[in-house]
From Swiss-Prot:
Keyword Lipid biosynthesis: yes
MF GO annotations: phosphate:acyl-[acyl carrier protein] acyltransferase activity
Gene source species: Polynucleobacter asymbioticus (strain DSM 18221 / CIP 109841 / QLW-P1DMWA-1)
Pfam families: FA_synthesis
Principal EC category: transferase
GO BP term, example: fatty acid biosynthetic process
Protein name: Phosphate acyltransferase
Length: 337
């Protein structure tokens, strides 16, 4: 089957400078893909003109006169900017013109507009944001929620686990992913009441529930999926990103300390590059907004051309393998049992 991806070409810190070249790269890799670029036609065409190998016959441009800025309040993005590139791109999914939408724009606005236009799936109380975090196994641990829901009830967390279970099966090809519940300890007696009740509910499902996991388990790859509320998830995500940047800076600083350490850096270059590749956050770019009646992928706002390509890849795999339909079917089965 062919896959059509709608791209908010104006979103993120870099806009068309990143989104359009990344789209062209992706089209060269996948002959079964068509792309809809939404935004300022003049700016989009200027970048396309610099990409002579771009398969123009598989690119459609749709004009949008407004842009959702990274610091725009949700109310302005949702109610006032009705011709924004983000909104028009999401509408393409709503109308069936595209199978998925990818945006590097404002996360809060993307969730709000997507929820308003696409609505949530039957049986899903709240959408959640899920993404993969690098682990020592080199496979990535899928974690959710990452900020959409600061406060959650036990049933919300169970639904997050159910949606992530399908997503990992579809996108990562793991037939029976293991699921961990983030807690302050592995013991069932630990945690607040929400976590304790969630643990009990998850044990009653047919999911491959491992049990409670701690923060270090995320990076060890103890489970394929880690579930938590959006407040905790966002703190973990930002803390891990900050730690990675700090360690990278410290290593660079130490190797530049003297001529001897610079020579050591040359000797250690190969293993260092291997480690860098395994923990490169760009390779894990592309958070999925789960629970909506359409596939929405959130790329990091600062994503470069290389990273944005991975967000497109995630949208492609999710669409090609009917992720949204399979999540919907899972909730139909759940409600009838």
């Amino acid at each position: 089957m062919s896959v059509t991806l709608a791209i908010d070409a104006m979103g993120g810190d870099h806009g068309v400078v990143v989104t359009v070249p990344a789209a062209c790269d992706f089209l060269e890799k996948h002959s079964d893909v068509k792309i809809i670029l939404v935004g300022d036609p003049d700016l989009i065409k200027q970048v396309l003109d610099k990409s002579p190998k771009a398969p123009i016959e598989r690119i459609q441009i749709i004009a949008a006169s407004e842009v959702v800025l990274m610091d725009d309040p949700i109310e302005i993005a949702l109610r006032r900017k009705k011709d924004s590139s983000m909104r028009v791109a999401i509408v393409q999914v709503k109308e069936g013109a595209a199978d998925a939408v990818v945006s590097s724009g404002n996360t809060g606005a993307l969730m709000a507009i997507s929820r308003y236009i696409l609505k949530t799936l039957d049986g899903v109380d709240r959408p959640a944001i899920a993404t993969a975090i690098p682990n020592e196994l080199g496979l990535g641990t899928t974690m959710l929620d990452l900020g959409a829901n600061a406060d959650c009830e036990p049933m919300h967390l169970v639904q997050f686990a159910q949606m992530a279970n399908v997503m990992v099966q579809v996108v990562d090809g793991k037939p029976n992913p293991s699921i961990g519940l983030l807690n302050i300890g592995e013991e069932v007696i630990k945690g607040n009441e929400v976590v304790k009740q969630t643990s009990e509910l998850l044990r009653q499902t047919n999911l491959n529930f491992y049990g409670n996991v701690e923060g270090n388990d995320i990076f060890k790859g103890t489970t394929d999926i880690v579930v938590c509320d959006g407040f905790v998830g966002n703190v973990v995500l930002k803390a891990s990103e900050g730690l990675a940047k700090m360690m990278s800076g410290l290593i660079r600083k130490e190797f530049n300390r003297s001529l001897f350490t610079k020579l050591m850096a040359v000797c250690a270059m190969v293993p260092l590059l291997r480690v860098r590749k395994r923990v490169d956050h760009r390779r894990y770019n592309g958070a999925v907004l789960l629970g909506l009646r359409g596939c929405v992928i959130k790329s990091h706002g600062s994503a470069d051309r290389f990273a944005f390509g991975f967000a497109l890849e995630r949208a492609y795999e999710a669409s090609k393998n009917h992720m949204v339909e399979r999540i919907a079917a899972a909730f139909v089965v759940e409600t009838t049992e």
